[in-house]
Amino acid sequence: MKKTLRFAAVAAGLVASLITVAPSASAQALRAQGASLADEVVAVVNNDVITGRELDQRVGLIARRLQQQKAPVPPTDQLRAQVLNQMVLERIQVQRAKDDGIVVDNATVQATLGRLAQANGMPLDQYKARIEAQGVPWDLFVRDARTELMLSKLREKEVDSKITVSDAEVASYIASQRGPNAGAQQDLRLEHIFVKAPTNAPQADIDAAQKKAEGLLQQALASGTNFERLAKSQSEADDAKKGGDLGFKAPSSLPSDVVDAVSKLRPGEVNPTLIRVPDGFEIVRLVDRRASQNPAASPKIVQTHVRHILLRVGEGKSESQARQQLIDIRRQIEAGGDFEKFARTYSQDGSASQGGDLGWISPGETVPEFERAMNALQDGQVSNPVRTEYGYHLIQVLGRRDAEGSVQQQMDIARQAIGQRKAEQAYSDWLRELRDSSYVQIKLPVGQ
């Protein structure tokens, strides 16, 4: 299987992992949140509306999800406003997708649901039963899955497909990682003050945040201002208590806008303009520069040492039989059985004679389903049965290591990192422009 599995992976499927098992609030909980608002319009979005019932359902789901994750649940007013804003952005994008003729067929939705069921270690019928047992109607779950897929296709069409990365940018990125010669690269020590203003926030909130940030910038630029003290009292970043001190950072680890801004500064100077980042506004002060502590570093790849047991479907073995056999084998391994012996006995892959050992695998060398499952495992952990085009697998990760990789792998990593950074910024800009060009009227009553 090593030779069979190790081919360049095709583009991964749409991001099914975004759609997780999360129960909706019960009807009783929804009523408690304000039954009188159930059918009241809380937002007008172009020619569409969002009702109180829809908002309550989404708020209940998110509140339950936060509780499950043991994360703090914001005050009701704040949570409702945040969720409504998310729903407005989602509705605008769905409208745009429909205008663009983007559709998601049933086969694609079913394939996504199948991957979700597999990721949760169960067949689709069991997965459906679990979703419904947790209070989420299956048709609602399927609809949300279809929406996620539609928005992924929209982003691919409107944003991601238009991102280009030149060979010169790749070369520059690699050079910034390695340095043209020892000691040539300089790490930067920065302090910053951050004011939150997510791109998807209401425009009024963004304007207010910008006004606050501009006031803080003027204070930071004023003679005699203690930047560290100002950051401690005003910054909304997690490092505010440290005076916004980021420590020394390699330029490649910082947003390009920040690097460009501080490149013109002398130590001790504050950048004279605000820097817009996806989550808000940054005020940056250059504290110091120093020769890179790792000038020869190259872009690294993470290799995974993995072994597996493969059962092929067909040849007298059905889908359910192959899957059940691997469930039984996994149960025995978890009880202390020897993975290697099971692989030698049952695996139908060429690696069976090596106990299923595939050696060290680099990113992109396996099919996407196998790689996603492998990447989700901790060292020593055994997966649930994983379906690929080859059959069903049990996968065990034996270890991970950083490796420099080939020249081509380094270029691929650089291109991916640059493209990802560009795509996130482009998506934030596009989403802001899309909202600005839409008619949105928020009717959410104050205190509800």
Curated annotation (Swiss-Prot):
UniProt signal peptide: 1-27
A GO CC term assigned to this protein in UniProt: outer membrane-bounded periplasmic space
Encoding gene, per UniProt annotation: surA
Gene source species: Burkholderia thailandensis (strain ATCC 700388 / DSM 13276 / CCUG 48851 / CIP 106301 / E264)
Subcellular localization(s) per the UniProt record: Periplasm
Catalytic activity reported: [protein]-peptidylproline (omega=180) = [protein]-peptidylproline (omega=0)
Domain notes: The PPIase activity resides only in the second parvulin domain. The N-terminal region and the C-terminal tail are necessary and sufficient for the chaperone activity of SurA. The PPIase activity is dispensable for SurA to function as a chaperone. The N-terminal region and the C-terminal tail are also required for porin recognition.
Region Disordered: start-end pairs: 230-249
Main location: periplasm
Biological processes, Gene Ontology terms: Gram-negative-bacterium-type cell outer membrane assembly; protein folding; protein stabilization
Protein name (record): Chaperone SurA
S-S bonds: none
Main function: Chaperone involved in the correct folding and assembly of outer membrane proteins. Recognizes specific patterns of aromatic residues and the orientation of their side chains, which are found more frequently in integral outer membrane proteins. May act in both early periplasmic and late outer membrane-associated steps of protein maturation.
InterPro entries per the UniProt record, alphabetical: OMP_Chaperone_SurA, PPIase_dom_sf, PPIase_PpiC, PPIase_SurA, SurA_N, Trigger_fact/SurA_dom_sf
